[in-house]
Design a protein with these regions (language model features):
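Intrinsically disordered, low-complexity, mixed-charge
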Residues: 1-88
Length: 88
């Protein structure tokens, strides 16, 4: 299955972005992780079908209600097997 790394930029920390990302990933059946970066962004590594990943990317472009997303940088990665989705 495809694996993508997302770097989500903007006002994305302190707005429950990671919790929302985990909820969305679980809802659509993605596996992987999400974490805050030291420079104030959020990074996610997700594995699933192309359709699942596209849905997660679409959600990430807006995020939760209080987030202000300015950019989402997406890179394709080697497939990584995960069991579930975690917040790091």
């Amino acid at each position: 299955m495809p694996t993508n790394r997302l770097l989500i930029k903007g006002k994305v920390q302190g707005v429950f972005f990671r919790a929302g990302a985990k909820e969305m990933a679980n809802k659509i059946g993605l596996t992987g992780w999400v974490k805050n970066t030291i420079d104030g962004n959020v990074e996610a590594l997700v594995t699933g079908t192309a359709l699942q990943i596209d849905e997660f990317i679409a959600w990430s472009r807006q995020g939760p209600k209080r987030a202000i997303v300015t950019n989402v940088i997406i890179t394709r990665e080697e497939e990584e097997p995960f069991s579930g989705f975690i917040i790091k």
